[in-house]
Amino acid sequence: MAEISILGAGGLTGKELLLLLSRQKEHEVVHITSDKLAGKTLAEVFPEIPFPKNLTFHSHEAAIPSQSLVVLAVPNNVSIESAPKFLDSGHKVIDLSGAYRLHNQEIFEKAYQLKHTQFSYVDKAVFGIPEIFRDKLKNADFVSNPGCFSTSVILPVFLLNELRKNLRPRIIADSKSGVSGAGGRTEDAGYSYTGVYENFRAYKILSHQHEPEIKEYIYANSGLLEPEVIFTPHLLPVYRGILSTIVLELDTESFSDPISILQNSCKNEPFLRILKTPEEIELKRVQHTNFLDISVRKRGNTLVIVSALDNLIKGAAGQALQNINLMTGTKEVLGLFP
């Protein structure tokens, strides 16, 4: 059994993680924080979550249980300062922010418009996509959970296996997200459900912080000096879910059936589902689940991949729970199936 402390448990991903943890009995939530909700019980704030009614929100500065695994569901600037403190105190840490994903400080500070004062800790973090880095995650003390958009693009491309060596240095990714994937709590009405009702628009064109993350992890060790990723996110008039369309070219037209390659890559993966046609991919198949659905179609040397996931689960809290399970030697699927 692992004891879990969640900083930022009152936010969207923090609440989702609490819901997932309530489905299992191996891990115990012993400490939750929210500066806005400090002093309130979990039962007062989220009566639908069946945890002990005396579990109470603390401020972020409150001392946490010494043996607990710490999950940071807080803004980037808070994670930058908090993660090193907890690591140096002997805690295992999972960070859901983007603070420790990128390995180039200049690129990070441009993408996030934020000075990184603890950049030496980036190299201590394992990028938390279990289907790619499972063995490293089993021995990790510090995990940087991937972005929701990033997961929907990086993982499908990675699963192409031997075809990745033939990638041309340009990928176009077009992603549509529910409002909870784009700052659902912001006071900007344009990012609220009422702001997107009967509406549809792009945002952060050529400036979204997940674009360099996608670029770094898709082209890692490729030898390509200047690969290009063009990533465009859009806001859908729905609450949760991401559907991504990824267009890439290979330097050859002679290669194996990409559906067969994906199926072979995923044959032992509990949360990856390969569908026969891209038209079958849709949000309702993945909402409220930890599944990532993928399909692909080939024309000449061009591949069009379509993927879908729930941004709050496989794109955030569910993937974090996969990582908690791996880091603590627990069955990976624990808490992730109803």
Curated annotation (Swiss-Prot):
It is found in: Cytoplasm. InterPro entries: AGPR_AS (IPR023013), AGPR_type-1 (IPR000706), NAD(P)-bd_dom_sf (IPR036291), NAGSA_dehydrogenase (IPR050085), Semialdehyde_DH_NAD-bd (IPR000534). Pfam families: Semialdhyde_dh (PF01118), Semialdhyde_dhC_1 (PF22698). GO terms for cellular component: cytoplasm. It catalyses: N-acetyl-L-glutamate 5-semialdehyde + phosphate + NADP(+) = N-acetyl-L-glutamyl 5-phosphate + NADPH + H(+). SMART domains: Semialdhyde_dh. Keywords: Amino-acid biosynthesis, Arginine biosynthesis, Cytoplasm, NADP, Oxidoreductase. Pathway: Amino-acid biosynthesis; L-arginine biosynthesis; N(2)-acetyl-L-ornithine from L-glutamate: step 3/4. The keyword Amino-acid biosynthesis applies. Its EC number is 1.2.1.38. The active site is at C148. It is an enzyme of class 1 (oxidoreductase). It comes from the Bacteria. GO terms for molecular function: N-acetyl-gamma-glutamyl-phosphate reductase activity; NAD binding; NADP+ binding. GO terms for biological process: L-arginine biosynthetic process. Belongs to the NAGSA dehydrogenase family. Type 1 subfamily. Catalyzes the NADPH-dependent reduction of N-acetyl-5-glutamyl phosphate to yield N-acetyl-L-glutamate 5-semialdehyde. This is N-acetyl-gamma-glutamyl-phosphate reductase. It comes from Leptospira borgpetersenii serovar Hardjo-bovis (strain JB197). The gene is argC.
